């Protein structure tokens, strides 16, 4: 990325990430669509309550794997094969123990979590069952992410995408057969998700064992090395904390939505699936910006940094125009995929109003993600954490004020408020950074 036009580099790097994001989002949306249409509004609401809690666990796992991936990439680049294998072994052993403990703790604390979130009595039982089963799937999620990080560290970003695609298709097929065809309930929805996660982890392990021997630890390398664990945790801690802030905020907002009733909960679950299709690809473009800036900074090509960042922002805004327009035009049709039968019209009306506002507001996270990508590429991880905490904290506070007064649209305005504050912090700091680095 240190030579040639920035647009080509950024676009080609972001496309596989975007495809992976869309597959993961489709994977999640299929669960919600099938639950809402074949089981009912209560099942859709139950998944909506459980989602933010599980996202907190998943993003913490992702942060740990990102930290390990950085170290594995360094070892691979330095041709230190033994260190590469030992880093992967340390990550897998420590992460497995951590995830098993988190799964057990999550299962034990599920009733307390649901009471803290003020989950309505009508869905308390099924939400608890769904959440406990998905907690048990956390170790499989970790294994897939850790193995995928290993494959990406040696330059293979396509194979993890294939396993993710297989997992998404398997989940959809199992849901359609067992829930849509045979009439099983919410328990089956949770189980099929865990089975699909386990399948992706197993495929990655088998592939690595047979096709990527340079990643496979030997018999004497299966141990936790403290000298490697420290850097893994340090690299991953800031990323994990930053990623965890958003789902914590979402859990707090979910508590405000829960007070609005089952219909609002179901609508919010549906619209957040649409939101994800806006936010997550914008984060992928930000990752491309990060890589571009980091490579050029490392190569001393500071003259390319600001130009590449401007191109990245244009890509972000271009994606917003596409996603915002589609959301505005198709929002009612999209929402009708999630619900059917009694109460569906109310859920669609609530969600449609929310998405009408958000289609415009999606421009704000396009900008904030671009700036976050810039700061990560410049090595300013603390700046990204401060910006995220400002945005999430004020968004949650605004939601607590607005949601009881104006309902679900209040959540949309709270999001916009948080993003505006984040930009008010990041934009001036960007110009200060450019002056300091003479960009």
Which functions belong to the PLM regions below?
Residues 1-14, 72-137, 181-237, 293-360, ...:
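Short alpha-helical transmembrane segments in multi-pass integral membrane proteins
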Residues 18, 22, 26, 30, ...:
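Generic alpha-helical transmembrane segments of integral inner-membrane proteins
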Residues 26-45, 114-121, 177-184, 244-277, ...:
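Helix-terminus/linker motif at the lipid-water interface of multi-pass membrane proteins
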Residues 44-104, 141-160, 267-331, 365-379, ...:
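Small-residue-rich hydrophobic transmembrane alpha-helices
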């Amino acid at each position: 990325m240190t030579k040639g036009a920035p647009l080509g580099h950024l676009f080609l790097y972001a496309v596989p990430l975007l495809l992976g994001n869309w597959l993961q989002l489709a994977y999640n949306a299929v669960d919600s669509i099938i639950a809402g249409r074949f089981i009912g509004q209560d099942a859709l609401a139950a998944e909506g309550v459980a989602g933010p809690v599980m996202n907190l666990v998943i993003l913490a796992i992702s942060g740990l794997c990102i930290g390990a991936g950085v170290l594995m990439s360094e070892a691979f680049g330095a041709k230190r094969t033994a260190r590469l294998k030992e880093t992967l072994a340390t990550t897998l052993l420590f992460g497995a123990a951590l995830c098993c403990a988190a799964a057990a703790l999550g299962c034990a604390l599920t009733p307390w979590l649901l009471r803290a979130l003020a989950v309505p009595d009508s869905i308390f039982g099924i939400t608890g069952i769904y959440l406990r089963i998905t907690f048990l799937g956390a170790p499989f999620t970790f294994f897939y992410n850790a193995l995928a990080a290993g494959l990406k560290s040696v330059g293979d970003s396509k194979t993890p995408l294939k396993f993710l695609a297989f997992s998404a298709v398997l989940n959809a097929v199992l849901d359609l057969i067992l829930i849509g065809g045979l009439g099983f309930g919410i328990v089956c929805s949770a189980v099929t998700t865990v089975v699909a996660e386990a399948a992706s982890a197993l495929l990655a392990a088998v592939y690595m064992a047979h096709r990527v021997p340079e990643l496979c630890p030997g018999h004497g390398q299966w141990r936790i090395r403290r000298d490697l664990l420290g850097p893994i945790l340090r690299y991953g801690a800031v990323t994990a904390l930053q990623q965890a802030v958003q789902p914590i905020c979402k859990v707090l907002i979910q508590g405000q939505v829960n007070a609005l009733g089952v219909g609002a909960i179901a609508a919010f679950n549906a619209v957040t699936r649409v939101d994800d299709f806006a936010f997550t690809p914008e984060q992928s473009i930000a990752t491309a910006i990060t890589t571009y800036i980091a490579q050029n900074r490392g190569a001393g090509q500071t003259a390319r940094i600001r130009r590449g960042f401007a191109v990245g922002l244009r890509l972000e805004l271009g994606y917003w125009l596409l996603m915002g327009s589609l959301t505005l035009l198709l929002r009612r049709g999209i929402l009708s995929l999630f619900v059917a039968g009694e109460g569906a019209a109310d859920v669609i009306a609530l969600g449609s109003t929310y998405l009408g506002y958000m289609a415009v507001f999606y421009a704000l996270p396009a900008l904030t993600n671009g700036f976050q990508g810039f700061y990560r590429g410049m090595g300013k991880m603390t700046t990204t954490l401060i910006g995220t905490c400002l945005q999430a904290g004020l968004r949650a506070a605004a939601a607590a004020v607005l949601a009881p007064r104006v309902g679900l649209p209040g959540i949309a305005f709270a999001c916009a408020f948080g993003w505006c504050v984040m930009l008010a912090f990041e934009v001036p700091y960007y110009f200060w950074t450019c002056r300091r680095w003479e960009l």
